[in-house]
Every structure is written in C-alpha cells, then in structure tokens.
Regions:
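Surface-exposed, charge/polar-rich loops and edge strands
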Residues: 2-41, 45-180
Length: 180
C-alpha cells in the first residue's frame, strides 16, 4: 500500500461543509484504507493500492466527494515522497522568513506550471510578497498576513492555474505525523 495526502479546496468555507466522519466514510467508500483527516480544513491522508495510478486518484476521490457531499471539491494529491520534499523546501532565506510577520504559504498546484505560467506568476512578486516555484508548488512569503497582502489569491490563480493553499507549518505537521 502507498500513502497519499489529498488537499481539498474550499472545504468548510461558507456553506461547503463536511464533517470529518463524512470525509473518512467517503474515502472508505471509494476504496482507500487507513483514512485520516488532519484538522477540519480538507487535509486527508490515506493508503491506496501500490499499483494504483496516481493520476486517476484525484478524479476518483472528487467523484466520491461529489456523491457524498452533494457539491464539487477539487482535490490536489501528493505522494509520501512529495510531501516530504515539500516540507523540506527552503525557498526563501531563513532570515527573510524569520523577519516576515506573515506565514510561509504553500500553494499546491494541479500540475507543474508551464514556463509562461511561471513567468506570469513570478512577475506578481513584490518586495512585500515574495514568490518562488518549485515543481508543482508555489511558495508565497507575505510580509504580513495573506488577507493584508496587495497580492490576491485570484491574481495568483489567474496567472498559474487552480490551486489550494496551506501554511508550510501545516505541511510540515502532516509530514511529521503521517510520513516520517
């Protein structure tokens, strides 16, 4: 069995609510084992068959979530190796991260961005909002909180494509708890 992390976009925001027990039941219904929910914010960990096609898992889970919850939920899947690699990334100098009043954010992308998408996205960076791209992740270091940033999520997404955002701290905690 291989272990995966699935990050759900827009769950438990406004009327798009899902209880942890419902998410676990959904994972089991679509055939995944050892399901767990990390916090109530759409972070799922589960085991799937080692031979399973990683490319097909998000659609399988999205279909199950739609049937179970009654609304569409985009899924951003990462393997154990990918989670460990993301948690180990240091896209900005340690002194920059320490000096920032904002938390380092990780945007999990649907796929690796094209060169043109990278260029458009990185052009949005400012002195107050630093951006870096590594693989299928965008790292954002806001000088203050993301809500106070001049750089909006919509602008980033328009440049790079669909994504869901987590703090680096959340990714590190998931890596330590489920993938160590």
């Amino acid at each position: 069995m291989a272990r995966y992390a699935a990050f759900l976009r827009g769950i438990n925001i406004n009327k798009r609510r899902a209880r942890n027990t419902d998410l676990i039941a959904c994972l089991e219904e679509v055939g995944f084992e050892e399901p767990a929910v990390f916090r109530a914010s759409g972070n799922l960990v589960f085991e799937g068959p080692s031979g399973a096609s990683v490319e097909k898992i998000p659609a399988r889970l999205e279909d199950g979530l739609k049937k179970s919850l009654g609304f569409e939920v985009p899924v951003f899947l990462r393997t154990a190796r990918q989670i460990k690699a993301i948690a180990g990334q240091e896209p900005f100098a340690a002194k920059e991260v320490k000096a920032s009043k904002g938390k380092l954010q990780v945007a999990l992308l649907a796929s690796k961005p094209t060169a043109a998408a990278k260029k458009r996205t990185l052009a949005l960076a400012t002195d107050k909002d630093k951006l870096a791209i590594r693989g299928s992740e965008l790292y954002w270091l806001p000088s203050a909180g993301t809500q106070d940033s001049e750089l909006g999520m919509k602008g980033i997404e328009d440049a790079i494509g669909p994504m869901t955002m987590r703090t680096m701290g959340t990714i590190e905690q998931i890596a330590a708890k489920y993938f160590s």
